[in-house]
Amino acid sequence: MAKILTVLIVACGLQMSASAQENSPYSRYGLGDLTPNHNVFTRGMGGISAALADHRDFNPNLSINFTNPASLSGINAALPGIKNTIFDVGTEIDYRILKSSNPAKKFTSANTYISYLQIAFPLTTKKMAAKKMSWAMSVGLKPVSKINYKIEKSERLTGIDSLHTLYEGSGGVNQAFFGTGLKIKNFSIGINAGYMFGTKDHSTILTFISDTVTNFYYTSNSATKTTFGGLFINGGMQYDFALAHDEKYPGIVTKNLRVGVYGNMQQNLKAHSNKVREIIIYDQNGGFVRLDSVYEDKDVKGNIKYPAMVGLGLAYQDANWMYGVDLEYGNWKNYRFYGQADAVQNNFTIRAGAQYYPAKGNTPVKKYFNFVKYRAGFYYGSDYIKTTSNRPEYGFTIGTGMPLTSLRRLSYPWQYVVLNTALEVGNRGNKQTNLRENLVRFSIGISMNAAWFQKPKYN
């Protein structure tokens, strides 16, 4: 299977030209190319997410961390009387360069798509706040993976005839989810639940081209179209350790350490497939006639096993700095598609990142860039797609969080829009592997925090 993957990637040739949609031969295996399971805010810090949440005593980031639902409890926790709603949307532009050392070739692809849409509602009451409790909920939609490839390969058979092979695939996996997070004193717990759904369509078209008979094309088509879906659930926990308090106001935390964990058990998705194996013939006008249906089976029921995953991390925060580190693990060896294993393997990733916020309590609001948050990070791990050799996956990231508001409102972070950006430069493979993929991903996120659904007290 791994050798087949290598051949397919090398065979891409000029098919992988820059376009509006990604053309990745890696997406032929497993559930496709996995999309980042992080919002733009955390992507700028290498993707650390397990222990990130807004703290009531620090300047908020106003972004919804869907990776660990326990973090929802931090939304607007500092101002329980204000029921501001956060709308969070992320988009990204990917540019990929795939390199093969033997033979020496280079292919490129580009794509733009929406990373996530989500909205969060704080539910904390004043009575809950008095008991050091906070609560919030969210709803959202995000992609889990993408499948999109078109690979062509031609070869001579007997010196006078040719065989043309076309591999095509499309689809992907998405999640529509509802989340809630509750914090009691220093402990937070949360849960995401919803529906995971998608499609996985594959076809292999073999065309025998006769050089001795004019305009004769003899083609076989093998195609499978699968739709699937099912309920999913994941959860998370966080705990805060106050390392220091304000000398004048002992109830205010000035240094905090948070630990977090999140994950999901193995999920079973119900699937339905339509399979066809047919022989067709192309005429000189480009049309075709079905000569024979070798095999056809409709509405074949089965299951897809989505593997268990877990992540844990810790994060330090004070008025100006935030540091964090995460460890992630995916049990992809248990992935099954209609009972069949695939070219996938267990994978792990380590992430680390930091954020710097220059503004202090006495910073003049005229100094706009002191109110911008600056981020950087990196990640290193193994790819879940299995090839002939272990391929590391690593990258470096930088990002910003820029308030979009007038200068006079910079001191009121709960009442403005934040533009988050993240630039990722990543790699799949190294000098020891025949195939390397370079990635440049630019992400933009908009977090809008406003009292959208509140009735005015006065007309």
Annotate the PLM regions.
Residues 21-459:
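Subset of outer-membrane beta-barrel
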Residues 1-25, 139, 459:
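Bacterial Sec-dependent N-terminal signal peptides
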